[in-house]
Regions:
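Short, small-residue-rich loop/turn micro-motifs
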Residues: 2-6, 35, 64
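Penicillin-recognizing serine hydrolase domain
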Residues: 48-180
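Conserved catalytic neighborhood of penicillin-recognizing serine enzymes
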Residues: 8-41, 117-132, 151
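Non-catalytic, solvent-exposed segments at the cell envelope interface
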Residues: 6-7, 20-28, 32, 44, ...
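Short, glycine/proline-biased beta-turn/loop segments that scaffold the active-site neighborhood
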Residues: 1-14, 106-114
Length: 180
């Protein structure tokens, strides 16, 4: 059930409506395609917000994300902290162990009878894009963690991960790294 409090979360709302009943698994689409912060909040509320945050932090501990701390589910709080290294580890874990979540980020759109969610991902059309997520906060500026399949030789490829914080132009920075 989507709450008024979840909808009050800063940012776009993915077309969610107060009182709407929606499966938690469907909330991943506005969250990952459109950066719906209220989608993140609604997921956390479904499981009890504090319990959810505790689980996020315990998962970070389990994955040895030593410098990552979650203070809110959307990543908006300036008290959320992480490092490029930790973001990279987390993306690798999701790619290997929760591939269905990672795969959502490769879709251009997802539609239900009530919603049409469209990707705002700048890298979606980049050759070899395997998935990822970008974001923005005043503290971290433009951020991104993405995975690409890059040609290694005429017949082989290699997955390359890119994680950036504090970028002023993540699209340019990622392009430069991919060309390196």
């Amino acid at each position: 059930l989507i709450s008024k409090k979840a909808l009050a979360t800063y940012g776009q709302n993915g077309g969610l409506r107060k009182g709407e009943k929606i499966a938690v698994s469907l909330l991943l689409y506005p969250l990952l395609l459109e950066s719906s912060n209220d989608g993140a909040e609604a997921i956390a509320e479904h499981f009890d917000r504090e319990t959810f945050l505790e689980k996020m932090n315990k998962t970070a501990e389990k994955l040895e994300l030593k410098k990552t701390k979650f203070e809110d589910p959307s990543g908006l709080s300036e008290k959320n902290v992480s490092t490029v290294s930790d973001m990279f580890k987390l993306a690798g874990y999701i790619f290997r162990e929760k591939k269905d979540i990672f795969d959502i980020t490769t879709q251009r759109k997802y539609a239900t009878t009530r919603h049409n969610w469209f990707s705002n991902n700048q890298f979606l059309l980049t050759n070899g894009y395997l998935g990822g997520k970008s974001g923005y906060t005043n503290e971290a500026l433009q951020t991104v963690v993405s995975l690409f399949s890059m040609p290694l030789s005429e017949t082989g490829t290699r997955n390359v991960g890119i994680a950036l914080l504090h970028s002023k132009d993540r699209q340019k920075d990622v392009k430069n790294l991919l060309q390196y």
